[in-house]
Swiss-Prot record:
Name of the featured protein: 6-phosphogluconate dehydrogenase, decarboxylating
GO cellular component, one term: cytosol
Gene expressing this chain: Pgd
Organism in which the protein naturally occurs: Mus musculus
SMART domains to which the protein is assigned, alphabetical: 6PGD (SM01350)
Modified residues annotated as Phosphoserine in this record: S57, S129
Length: 483
């Protein structure tokens, strides 16, 4: 007899925790795993005493579901998702729903959405953020795909999502086809940026200010009471305080080679594809790439010279406040760039995205959760057509208030030989964005000189002109040479 409200396939820790979360909110969940013994183990241990039911096969699982059947896939992105979909489709009926909760590439989600729509199956690709803890007690959920599915999953999704403010769920419908997974991808890219910015602040504290771990931990704890209040600042303070079994700080013992799963890279690639200068996330990805060259860096450190020791001007306390302001200003730039990419993607794919709603989805439950996101939500509520966060009065004023500190930090860091790829690219973007005239006119002249690519005059927009710069060429308007 059909009794389960929803099924979940994939009993790794995330899957188990999401099932227990749904159970806590009164939903009956059917659990399935490719290795069936894992279902029995889960029911006998973590799910003991709950209403969770198990299935011994996909057919058994489908038979236990109320209609329309709702199935969440929480398996490795890629071929595994397609394999399960292929096995599920013959067992499902028109109007049934498959939900992919993994970190799938948004184009795959769009393809699956279209393929399944032709077969009468409703497909949803949902970003799920917050890690194992979030899955258990309230993640940020970013569903997109076939909107006909939303009324049938909304109650479950919004019940289990993190809550902020007066109980607003960090979950709402994002948009058509791959929109949900695109938004999750950008979220992950911003996460890369936030983490790298914090690392650069830590590097400056350690090597310019010579702060001890307990001093740095205290600084981050204080910062967490300001506009930087966020999950990542909070855990950074905890990491700096943490001591190993020998009583010494653990952090200095950790190999300085950062891993990555690829979603930051996807964001940077998408930015290039859609012509958006999402420079900070790109630099955050490259910083991890550089960190992975550990052996080369060890050799280079013995051969390549840097600047002499720089004497810090002013007090350590005032420079620490400068670092805080530089971090805040750079963070604003990162989010401004992320939302630029979302806006461009919406134009490319015809999505109707609620940018304030997206900020709310990220406000709780996820890795980038912060008070700061509430300010972004407010900005888009004031002006839903806001072209760039930097043009909102609140953020314009915030950056202006931080600007002198930001420039001092970068100047001091450069003179001290501290790598600050994200601090510096953030300021470069800000300066570029606020310039009415950039030297790109010279690039256009160069392109026309060697490739006859033409240019426009400021006084004649829309009219493309080629100049015979040497007197030897013809007056062709373009050539096969591109740059």
């Amino acid at each position: 007899m059909a009794q389960a409200d929803i099924a979940l396939i994939g009993l790794a820790v995330m899957g188990q925790n999401l099932i227990l979360n749904m159970n806590d909110h009164g939903f009956v969940v059917c659990a399935f795993n490719r290795t069936v013994s894992k279902v029995d183990d889960f029911l006998a241990n973590e799910a003991k005493g709950t209403k969770v039911v198990g299935a011994q096969s996909l057919k058994d699982m489908v038979s236990k579901l109320k209609k329309p059947r709702r199935v969440i896939l929480l398996v490795k992105a890629g071929q595994a998702v397609d394999d399960f979909i292929e096995k599920l489709v013959p067992l499902l009926d028109t109007g049934d729903i498959i939900i992919d909760g993994g970190n799938s590439e948004y184009r795959d989600t769009t393809r699956r959405c279209r393929d399944l729509k032709a077969k009468g199956i409703l497909f949803v690709g949902s970003g799920v953020s917050g890690g194992e803890e979030g899955a258990r007690y309230g993640p940020s959920l970013m569903p997109g795909g076939n909107k006909e599915a939303w009324p049938h999953i909304k109650a479950i999704f919004q019940a289990i999502a993190a809550k902020v403010g007066t109980g607003e769920p960090c979950c709402d419908w994002v948009g058509d086809e791959g929109a949900g997974h695109f938004v999750k991808m950008v979220h992950n890219g911003i996460e890369y940026g936030d983490m790298q910015l914090i690392c650069e602040a830590y590097h400056l504290m350690k090597d310019v200010l010579g702060m001890r771990h307990e001093e740095m931990a205290q600084a981050f704890e204080e910062w967490n009471k300001t506009e930087l209040d966020s999950f990542l600042i909070e855990i950074t303070a905890n990491i700096l305080k943490y001591r190993d079994t020998d009583g010494k700080e653990l952090l200095p013992k950790i190999r300085d080679s950062a891993g990555q799963k690829g979603t930051g890279k996807w964001t940077a690639i998408s930015a290039l594809e859609y012509g958006m200068p999402v420079t900070l996330i790109g630099e955050a990805v490259f910083a991890r790439c550089l960190s992975s060259l550990k052996e080369e860096r060890v050799q280079a450190s013995q051969k390549l010279k840097g600047p002499k020791v720089v004497q810090l001007e002013g007090s350590k306390k005032s420079f620490l406040e400068d670092i805080r302001k530089a971090l805040y200003a750079s963070k604003i730039i990162s989010y401004a760039q992320g939302f630029m990419l979302l806006r461009q993607a919406a134009t490319e794919f015809g999505w109707t995205l609620n940018y304030g709603g997206i900020a709310l989805m990220w406000r709780g439950g996820c890795i980038i959760r912060s008070v700061f996101l509430g300010k972004i939500k407010d900005a888009f509520e004031r002006n839903p057509e806001l072209q760039n966060l930097l043009l909102d009065d609140f953020f314009k004023s915030a950056v202006d208030n931080c600007q002198d500190s930001w420039r001092r930090v970068i100047s001091t860091g450069v003179q001290a030989g501290i790598p600050m790829p994200c601090f510096t690219t953030a300021l470069s973007f800000y300066d570029g964005y606020r310039h009415e005239m950039l030297p790109a006119n010279l690039i256009q002249a160069q392109r026309d000189y060697f490739g006859a690519h033409t240019y426009e005059l400021l006084t004649k927009p829309g009219e493309f002109i080629h100049t015979n710069w040497t007197g030897h060429g013809g007056s062709v308007s373009s050539s096969s040479y591109n740059a």
